[in-house]
Amino acid sequence: MTFARAHRFALVSSLLAATALASSSLIAACEDRTGGDEPGHDAAALDSAAVPIDSGSDPDGDAGIDAAEAGGCPAGSTFRKARTTCPGAALPPPAALTTALGAAARGDVVPMAGMDVSTAPCLPVVVCTPNDAPTMLFSDSPEAPSQDGVLYADTVPAGRYRFYVYHANGGASLRKFPIVALNQGAQPAKITILRRGLAAPSTAYVSVGKTVLLDWLADRAPAVVTVPAATRVLLDDALDQLHAAQNELVHAIYDVTTDAPLKISFVSVPAATDAAAVTAGLGLLTRDVSHQRGTFPAADVLIAPAPPSGAAQRKGVQRLRLGLDEVDDTLEGVDAPTGVKQLLLGNYGMLYRVALGLPSPATAAISARGGAWGGAVRTGTTTTALPTATEQLATTTDAVVVGSLGGADGGAELHLISGGGSNLPIDLFFVTP
C-alpha cells in the first residue's frame, strides 16, 4: 500500500510541526510492492488549486465549535471536525462526462473529458465518529517476515475492534500469519466475528485486496469464538489455513466484539505449526522502517452534510478529498509493545460512511490523485468492486463511477473503503445536473 510519495513527505512535515513527534515515531505508509507511484499521476506535487484545509477544532476561526457545526452530526455519532470553507462556484462538468456518467453502471471507468476535478470546490461537510466505530489493530510491519515471531500484539478491554492483517512471506518455505487470542481471566470470554474478509494467498496484491474488501462488506451471520480461561485459541481456522508461498500475500480484515479483556497476537509461523500452542514462546519481531503496526481508535468515519441541511449542494461538480487530512484526519495510535506513537498515513482499513442526504439527484465518482487506486463500495445490500472490470483506476484522466444518490434516496449511506495496494489520496466527487 502506497501513500503517494510527495503527498506523504509534505504531510509528514506538517504533522511533525503540529505534533512535535520525534522522527523515529513516524512510520511511512504501507508500500505498494510494484515499486511506487504509477505513471500519469500527480504524486510530484499537491494540486495547486486545492482549497485550504479547515481546522478540525475551529473550522470558522472563532475560537470554538459552534452548536450548528457540532449539531451536524447525526444521532449516534460525535463531532470530529468541520470542512465548511468551500469557496468558488461549482465546476461545470464537460458534456461528454455527463453523458458518460448517465450511461455507466457502478464500477465502470469513464473518461473525465479533460476536466480537472482538483479545481472543483469541496462539498461542505461535518466529519463525525460513529459511536460504534471500532478500534483497529493494524499489522503490516514487518511486512514480509521470513522468521517466526509475534508481528503485533495488544491487550484490549471488552469492546468493538477491527483486526487488519497484511503480510507477505519473505522466506522460501510455506508460512502463515494467524491471529491468536489469549484469555488471561478466570472466566470464559467470547469473541463475536461480525465481518470477515479473506482471500487466497497470491502475488497479485491488488486483486487480493479487492477480494478481501468484497468479502468483508458482504452480509454474513455472526460467528462466536469462545476463549476458555487461561487459554490461547485461534481467532479463525480459515485464516490459519491460508499458507503463503514465497512473496505471496496473506490479507484479512475482521470486525469483532469482545466481552472481556483479551490479548490479541498476530503471529508469523511455518504452515504446519500449531500457532496457539507456540505463541507464548515467540519473540516480538522488529518493525521495519517502511510500514506500520499499531492500535488506532475510531477506525470508522461518518461524513454528513454541513448545516443547514440541504444548503451545501450546488449544481456542477463538488468534491471531497479523502486520505490527505482535508476530510479525514490521519489516524493516530501506538505500537503497543514498544509504546512508540504511530500515524497511519493514508488511513488504510478506515471505513468511510458517507451519509450526505443530498436533496437533489447527483452522480458520485472517484478520481485517483496519488497513484493507481482500487477499493469497494456498499449501498444498502449491494457491494461493488471499484473499478469492476480492472484491478485499479490507473490514471488521473479517468474516474470510476460510485453511483447515483440524492433526491428520492437521499438518505442512502455509502460505505467506502480503499484496498490494500492502493495509492491515496482520492477525490470523491459529485456531479449535480
Regions found by a protein language model. Give the residues of each.
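Terminal connector regions
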Residues: 242-280, 422-433
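Short, solvent-exposed loop/turn segments enriched in Ser/Thr/Gly
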Residues: 170-178, 248-252, 348-354, 409-412
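Asparagine-centered strand-capping/turn motif at beta-strand->loop junctions
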Residues: 167-173, 180-193, 256-258, 358-362, ...
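C-terminal functional regions that serve as terminal interaction/effector modules
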Residues: 86-118, 357-433
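Intrinsically disordered, low-complexity Pro/Gly/Ser/Thr-rich segments with frequent PxxP/GP/PP motifs
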Residues: 207-244, 383-411
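Short acidic, flexible loop segments centered on an aromatic residue
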Residues: 169-171, 185-213, 364-377
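Ser/Thr-rich, Pro/Gly/Ala-heavy low-complexity intrinsically disordered linkers and tails
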Residues: 25-78, 82
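A eukaryote-biased signal for short, well-structured alpha-helical docking elements
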Residues: 96-154, 290-329
